[in-house]
């Protein structure tokens, strides 16, 4: 990492010429300014599309072979990683340990600012050691300004353990360099409030993490078409969603879809396979296991076998 005591030259620290009169704007003008600046977040993701796609493919391959995905960061970056990780179990029915968020300062830093804890390289290294990271795992270091010692310590420790490393920052590589397998730069420019990286940098980070985790889960067969067929049916809202998916894809009545869902053990993916093939629960479960829980692959295998 570039040793930086003076950070004023970093892209995320520069003064935005478009917001010099911020304290004189009307509320409508302020909203319009934010809306205009936020377009740069979408453009920044588009500019990094090749690296993001590479990150999706690399991560999916590791997870397919038993690896785990870790996000690590401090402050806003750390909170966004924890948020994205926390959404994977209800959306894709993944075990909590498959995608994990690590934030400097631990759980307390989620609700109370603990930015002073980001300055320790050793703490970042210890966080990696504490998760028993191996060569199967993927570690994504997130730091808007690119300089967070906690994140750099974690990336260095992860590389030493043979893990795949991905770096996400909102400054160009010539300002802050790092040795990582995939280097993603999301360049949104100076913030509306100079240095407040919870704004555009936070927005673009959320967009990138949405793409990364969702893309990985798509590659792992967690969706069928654009349907959430691995949804965890843990409350009334998610049960309703599960029933609507079954109704839409099978043409069944809501009552029949509910019966099918119960027969499958509340697993939408298995319920669909049972309906389309006529298999019972255990046989359907076995067929899915043979195809790494990929519903489309399981259905095609069944059809090919029965046509031959």
Curated annotation (Swiss-Prot):
Annotated GO biological process: amino sugar catabolic process; N-acetylmuramic acid catabolic process; peptidoglycan turnover
The UniProt record lists the keyword Plastid: no
InterPro entries found in the cross-reference section: Etherase_MurQ, Glucokinase_regulatory_CS, MURQ/GCKR, SIS_dom, SIS_dom_sf
Keyword annotations from UniProtKB, A to Z: Carbohydrate metabolism, Lyase
EC number in record: 4.2.1.126
GO molecular function: carbohydrate derivative binding; carbon-oxygen lyase activity; ether hydrolase activity
Record flagged with keyword Chaperone: no
SIS domain sequence ranges: 59-222
Catalytic activity: N-acetyl-D-muramate 6-phosphate + H2O = N-acetyl-D-glucosamine 6-phosphate + (R)-lactate
Described function: Specifically catalyzes the cleavage of the D-lactyl ether substituent of MurNAc 6-phosphate, producing GlcNAc 6-phosphate and D-lactate.
Family listed: Belongs to the GCKR-like family. MurNAc-6-P etherase subfamily.
Note: A lyase-type mechanism (elimination/hydration) is suggested for the cleavage of the lactyl ether bond of MurNAc 6-phosphate, with the formation of an alpha,beta-unsaturated aldehyde intermediate with (E)-stereochemistry, followed by the syn addition of water to give product.
SUBUNIT field: Homodimer.
PANTHER family in the cross-refs: GLUCOKINASE REGULATORY PROTEIN
Listed HAMAP family: MurQ
Protein's name in the database: N-acetylmuramic acid 6-phosphate etherase
